[in-house]
Amino acid sequence: MTRIRRGYIARRRRTKIRLFASTFRGAHSRLTRTTTQQKMRALVSAHRDRGRQKRNFRRLWITRINAVIRENKVSYSYSRLIHDLYKRQLLLNRKILAQIAISNRNCLYMISNEIIK
């Protein structure tokens, strides 16, 4: 019997996986089975770390806001600022507040003084 050549579907799938893993080191970029395993592992890590990144940035923003607020007044803190913002119904999220705190501290001081009154 003559040899039957298989279709291109499996080859196309492996090529796609190889392109994804082309920047991996060693056998992880060459061998099909390890490439497939590393691709799954990379995608799992990427999915997990997207959630972690959101948490880490939120922590960073809160730390920055708290540091700038505590410089201005001794008795004022981040939690009081956020509480007063909600009481006054000012819709400023933590990312924007952190950017204001870094770039223009006087503006953040003005905001905090206004909401204290």
Curated annotation (Swiss-Prot):
Organism whose genome encodes this protein: Platanus occidentalis (Sycamore)
Subcellular location: Plastid, Chloroplast
Lyase among keywords: no
Domain of life of the organism encoding this protein: Eukaryota
PROSITE patterns: RIBOSOMAL_L20 (PS00937)
Any one GO BP annotation for this protein: ribosomal large subunit assembly
Protein name: Large ribosomal subunit protein bL20c
Pfam families given in the database record: Ribosomal_L20
GO CC term (a single one): ribosome
Entry similarity comment: Belongs to the bacterial ribosomal protein bL20 family.
GO MF terms, alphabetically ordered: rRNA binding; structural constituent of ribosome
UniProt KW Acetylation keyword: no
Key words of the record: Chloroplast, Plastid, Ribonucleoprotein, Ribosomal protein, RNA-binding, rRNA-binding
Record's function text: Binds directly to 23S ribosomal RNA and is necessary for the in vitro assembly process of the 50S ribosomal subunit. It is not involved in the protein synthesizing functions of that subunit.
